[in-house]
């Protein structure tokens, strides 16, 4: 029996393909009802043969689907809700309703309230009512959500809590295409609205592929009701799709476990005629894009040429300036700003000031002092040291002298007396001794000086930074008079 049923299904599919594809590529904008009738009849006979073979194991409410293949994959996901003249759900299907929590009431009271509301409008298809509070508490775990998903065939929800459901029910409802359909429970004609939601269908067009399926009925329905539902779906597609009916490529009818039988096919010529304007617009856009790219490349080449010309001009100007100037210094090429009269004046004034500063710094070259000689400034400092017995404050180094170099220190063995005993001919810059005596007479504190105090050695001056402290010179050890040696008597 099963072999004969499969043979009949294949023969029906062959007849369907032969009738659906005409010899000439004529535009078929309307659906052929005879072809739809043949395909549906073949599917029903196949399902009856399977029922006789497997007996009670067969599901009597096996669903029928209409497969839609589009010419182009859409850029965005599309969810189209369509109304059908005949209900596609049987009486044995379980339907669940999610409701809002009523104020100042428990979950049991809210369920009773909405059950009375449905009975008042004569609605008996809803099998269970679940409030939002019970959904949060009892169906929080992963296993509970899967159990809820498998226990019901269709889900309805109150329009007031529709935005709260995605975080509560999870992603599995959306993956298995069991998204709850929103209903306005406050409407006056509630029975009609709920029946339209239950009896209608939804087309989910994904952006991952060009093929999608729509539920159009079940095996227990009459053939005429199924055909009317298919015609209603095709009308809805021609209105809701982005490019209307021209975007439909193929239509098939199938069950969950059977082969797909074709009922409509379009041709490439029809698609080209329908999308002639769109193709022209695309060509124009591509031509504009290519023009922009060419212009951009031309601008890049012009910029490169300008930069190369500037570099060559600067090199040539350097080569011209070098032989003209007899000095070793090489003049730098003037920039564009220096070529203007205003900028040139400013640059000349600054250049003069810089030249003067460099000349002054060059004139102030520090003079080197020999080791054995002394300057008059050093003599004055030594005289004050002998008079007061205190060190003179350390002078900061001259800013004109370089800080990196150190001045040589005086020898440690040299005492002030030895320095004074030098001949005046060797040191022409020395002052006469008369001035030294006059300075001694003016300072009254010279007589109060302690005779036991030895004169301090002259400090070695280092050109260091002013922040560093100068080291103190070590005092010379006291010299005790030696006892004269008495010759031994023989």
From Swiss-Prot:
Q: Please name the InterPro entries in this protein's record.
A: Ribosomal_uL1-like, Ribosomal_uL1/biogenesis, Ribosomal_uL1_3-a/b-sand
Q: Look up and give the organism this protein is from.
A: Homo sapiens (Human)
Disulfide-bonded cysteine pairs: these are none
Modified-residue entries (Phosphothreonine), positions: 340, 358, 375, 415, 423, 465
Tissue and organ expression note: Expressed at high intensities in the heart, skeletal muscle, and placenta.
Phosphoserine is carried by which residues?
A: 361, 392, 396, 427, 443, 469
Q: Would you identify the family this protein belongs to, as annotated?
A: Belongs to the universal ribosomal protein uL1 family. Highly divergent.
Q: What is the lineage of its organism?
A: Eukaryota, Metazoa, Chordata, Craniata, Vertebrata
- Where do the coiled-coil regions begin and end? 280-313
**Position(s) of the covalent cross-link Glycyl lysine isopeptide (Lys-Gly) (interchain with G-Cter in SUMO2)?**
120, 254, 380, 435, 461
Q: What's a single GO BP term from this record?
A: osteoblast differentiation
> What gene does this protein come from?
RSL1D1
Query: What name appears for this protein in its UniProt entry?
Result: Ribosomal L1 domain-containing protein 1
Which residues are annotated with the PTM N-acetylmethionine? 1
What Pfam families does UniProt report for this protein, alphabetically? Answer: Ribosomal_L1
């Amino acid at each position: 029996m099963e072999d004969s049923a499969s043979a009949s299904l294949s023969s029906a599919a062959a007849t369907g393909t032969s009738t659906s594809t005409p010899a000439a590529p004529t535009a078929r904008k309307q659906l052929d009802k005879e072809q739809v009738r043949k395909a549906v009849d073949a599917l029903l006979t196949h399902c009856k043969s399977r029922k006789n073979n497997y007996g009670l194991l067969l599901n009597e409410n096996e669903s029928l689907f209409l497969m839609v293949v589009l010419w182009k994959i859409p850029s965005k996901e599309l969810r189209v809700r369509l109304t059908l003249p005949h209900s596609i759900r049987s009486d044995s299907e379980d339907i669940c309703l999610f409701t809002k929590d009523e104020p100042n009431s428990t979950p049991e009271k809210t369920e009773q309230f909405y059950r009375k509301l449905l009975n008042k409008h004569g609605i008996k298809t809803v099998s269970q009512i679940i409030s939002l509070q019970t959904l949060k508490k009892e169906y929080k775990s992963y296993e509970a959500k899967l159990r809820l998903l498998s226990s019901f065939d269709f889900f309805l929800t109150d329009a007031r809590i529709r935005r709260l459901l995605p975080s509560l029910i999870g992603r599995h409802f959306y993956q298995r295409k069991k998204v709850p359909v929103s209903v306005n429970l406050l409407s006056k004609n509630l029975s009609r609205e709920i029946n339209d939601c239950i009896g209608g269908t939804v087309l989910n067009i994904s952006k991952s592929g060009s093929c999608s399926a729509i539920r159009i009925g079940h095996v227990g329905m009459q053939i005429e009701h199924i055909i009317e539902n298919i015609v209603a779906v095709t009308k809805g597609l021609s209105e809701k799709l982005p490019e209307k009916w021209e975007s439909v490529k193929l239509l098939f009818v199938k069950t969950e476990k059977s082969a797909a039988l074709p009922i409509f096919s379009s041709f490439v010529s029809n698609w080209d005629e329908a999308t002639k304007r769109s193709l022209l617009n695309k060509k124009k856009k591509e031509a504009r894009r290519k023009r922009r790219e060419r212009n951009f490349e031309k601008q890049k080449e012009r910029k490169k040429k300008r930069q190369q010309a500037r570099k060559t001009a600067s090199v040539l100007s350097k080569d011209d300036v070098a032989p003209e100037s007899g000095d070793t210094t090489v003049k730098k090429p003037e920039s564009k700003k220096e070529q203007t009269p205003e900028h040139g004046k400013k640059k000349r004034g600054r250049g003069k000031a810089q030249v003067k500063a460099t000349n002054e710094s060059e004139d102030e070259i520090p003079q080197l002092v020999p080791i054995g000689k002394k300057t008059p400034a050093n003599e004055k400092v030594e005289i004050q040291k002998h008079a007061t017995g205190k060190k003179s404050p350390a002078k900061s180094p001259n800013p004109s002298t370089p800080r990196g170099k150190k001045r040589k220190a005086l020898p440690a063995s040299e005492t002030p007396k030895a320095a004074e005993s030098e001949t005046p001919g060797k040191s022409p810059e020395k002052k006469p001794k008369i001035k030294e005596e006059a300075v001694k007479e003016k300072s009254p504190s010279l007589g109060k000086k302690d005779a036991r105090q030895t004169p301090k050695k002259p400090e070695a001056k280092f050109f260091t930074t002013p922040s560093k402290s100068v080291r103190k010179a070590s005092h010379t050890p006291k010299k005790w008079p030696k006892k004269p040696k008495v010759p031994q008597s023989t």
